Swiss-Prot record:
It is found in: Plastid, Chloroplast thylakoid membrane. Residues 1-48 form a transit peptide. Residues 49-115, 167-180, 228-275, 323-335, 379-384 are stromal. This is Thylakoid membrane protein TERC, chloroplastic. GO terms for biological process: seedling development; thylakoid membrane organization. Disulfide bonds: none annotated. Disruption phenotype: Pigment deficiency and seedling lethality. Interacts with ALB3. One of its GO terms (cellular component) is chloroplast thylakoid membrane. Integral thylakoid membrane protein that plays a crucial role in thylakoid membrane biogenesis and thylakoid formation in early chloroplast development. Is essential for de novo synthesis of photosystem II (PSII) core proteins and required for efficient insertion of thylakoid membrane proteins, presumably via interaction with ALB3. May assist synthesis of thylakoid membrane proteins at the membrane insertion step. It comes from Arabidopsis thaliana.
Length: 384
């Protein structure tokens, strides 16, 4: 018989709740050694009271049993309802966690954009301050050469970013590793361009006819930009990609941000290293256009080097800002083609003695690039 029936019939005082707390005294484990002949618990119960309780318990109706059954039914129903509640709680938890993760991702992306914007603004501000300093020390002519070279290099660097986006998409580089690839690519670009500028300066000082060769390169690049159709996102037939894949044994998957990993006991390169190699070779190919273009504006190696350096330093942060919206700058590439064609014609005219001032060159470069950007933004707003 359950304890509830005993309480109901008055043997024990009724409790205010379903939980009964009994205080059991603690007896020493060596009670027999102390001379006690009976169990300590038997000493607590009055024999007459125990027999009376047994007689009354034998005549009680099975009320407590029915109450126990009701309790079991209620517990069973609660157990049956519990999975549904758990499912609802799990669904709510999943939805709330997805919302939280989405909000966290948006917050992190916003913070990344803010940091990149500040970095780009700092690089541009530093370049402007440097150009003003050159103007104060060397005159307006040198400052115009620097700004013309800087704007030209910056626009060509933005054009390079179109190819970087295609390379990252082709090799499926995770977003968290793209900055590492760009860092190595920019470091290699600085070293290569510095070497190329020194060699180009020495060559132009000895061989004036090299100007015609550089002008031909710029005119050919301008023609290619005008004649090229929509960017092909499939780089499987690209010469640089095929060359790197031929000479660099690469695994089929990434291994974190590592450039090398062991595959079947053999040390192989990961696709991340292959991506860096393609980025480096692509920048070398672009430098063949950009370096002659700056030499078409100025022959001062210091101006050529510093304008390149300032244009490249903020390239990684600039990529973060405009990588998602590059498709919207559809008129930027034709405007760059106009600039390259103009610089090529200018170099040919300079070779034959017809000089175009640096200020005029700066105006043509700035006007062409700004027109391309404004046309792209206008076309975007009209489509939306």
């Amino acid at each position: 018989m359950s304890l509830a029936s005993v309480i109901h019939h008055g043997i024990l005082p009724p409790a205010k709740s379903d939980r009964i707390f009994l205080t059991i005294p603690v007896f020493p484990p060596d009670f027999r050694a102390r001379g006690w002949t009976k169990s300590p618990f038997s000493l607590l119960i009055n024999p007459s009271l125990a027999s009376a309780a047994n007689r009354r318990l034998s005549h009680l109706p099975p009320i407590a049993c029915s109450r126990g059954i009701d309790q079991e039914d209620e517990e069973k129903e609660s157990r049956e309802l519990l999975p549904h509640k758990n499912d609802e709680n799990a669904t709510t938890s999943r939805s709330s966690s997805s919302v939280d993760s989405g909000g966290l991702k948006d917050y992190q992306q916003e913070e990344t954009y803010k940091t990149s914007f500040k970095t780009v603004a700092l690089c541009v501000g530093t370049a402007v301050a440097f150009g003003i300093g050159i103007g104060l020390k060397e005159g307006v002519g040198k400052a115009s050469e620097f700004f013309a070279g800087y704007i030209l290099e910056q626009s060509l660097s933005v054009d390079n970013l179109f190819v970087f986006v295609l390379v990252f998409k082709y090799f499926k580089v995770p977003l968290m590793y793209q900055n590492k690839v760009l860092t190595y690519g920019i470091a290699g670009a600085i070293v290569f361009r510095f070497t190329l500028i020194l060699l180009g300066t020495a060559t132009l000082q000895k061989f004036e006819a090299v100007n015609l060769l550089l002008a031909a390169v710029l005119l050919y690049s301008s023609f290619k930009l005008f004649a090229s159709e929509e960017d092909d996102t499939d780089l499987s037939d690209n010469f640089i990609v095929k060359t790197c894949q031929r000479f660099i044994p690469v695994t089929s998957s990434y291994d974190g941000n590592r450039f090398f990993t062991k595959h079947d006991g053999i040390l192989k390169a990961t696709p991340l290293l292959l991506t860096v190699a393609v980025i480096e070779l692509s920048d070398i190919a672009f430098a063949v256009d950009s370096i002659p273009a700056v030499f078409g504006v100025t022959r001062d190696p210091f101006i050529v080097l510093t304008s390149n350096l300032f244009a490249i330093l903020g390239l990684r942060s600039l990529y973060t800002l405009i990588s998602e919206g590059m498709d919207e700058l559809e008129y930027l590439q034709p405007s760059i083609a106009v600039v390259l064609g103009f610089i090529g014609v200018k170099m040919i005219l300079d070779f034959f003695g017809f000089h175009i001032s640096t200020e005029a060159s700066l105006g043509v470069v700035a006007l062409s690039l700004s027109t391309g950007v404004l046309l792209s933004l206008t076309n975007k707003s009209s489509d939306s």
